[in-house]
């Protein structure tokens, strides 16, 4: 099954939309619109009458943004959107272990926003780094298994770090682990224009892999705001 975003450019880059059974990684710098991109799929998945489980490890809740994008209060959405908020890396792992218990028949989308936030905080203690790498790999593997075994689309948002070669580009946190599990990898970055973002499909290779999006209150659009007037 394909879950479209409702934005033609995004769906073309993803070969129609999010594929169920697949693990999609989205990474980008701060304010690039990773959460908005994820919520774009939440909104459209609800329109298709399917459900979403949204695991939020960020310090801010996606509720206000979701209400802004849909123009309706969350109470009108909660029959199709379940938001869960772990308080630490180990709690996140325990929640991912139990996700299968929350998969009702209509759930087709699982979003983790972001998988690596608590992981990065744990890395401050160098004595536990190996265990933290192993735990992140375990969590990603469970999510990939859920996607495959339950025919779900899993979207994992990821933070970034500067590349070691010293240019101004960035790479995803825990790149080797995330590359191993990801079927699709999408990169978002802030461009020069107001609300302008660059989206690129890093993998798999293929035609039509990048484009420009514009961030609006209602979500992403592929048309410049002044072109829509």
What name fits each language-model region?
Residues 3-7, 35, 89-92, 133-136:
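A conditional alpha-helix N-cap/helix-loop micro-motif detector
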Residues 146-229:
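Phosphate-binding/switch region of NTP-binding enzymes
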Residues 89, 96-177:
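P-loop NTPase motor core
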Residues 19-98:
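Conserved P-loop
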Residues 12, 23-26, 185:
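A positional/architectural concept
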Residues 16-18, 44-48, 73-76, 101-105, ...:
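Conserved catalytic network of the ASCE P-loop NTPase/AAA+ motor domain
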Residues 5-18:
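Pre-Walker A adenine-sensing motif
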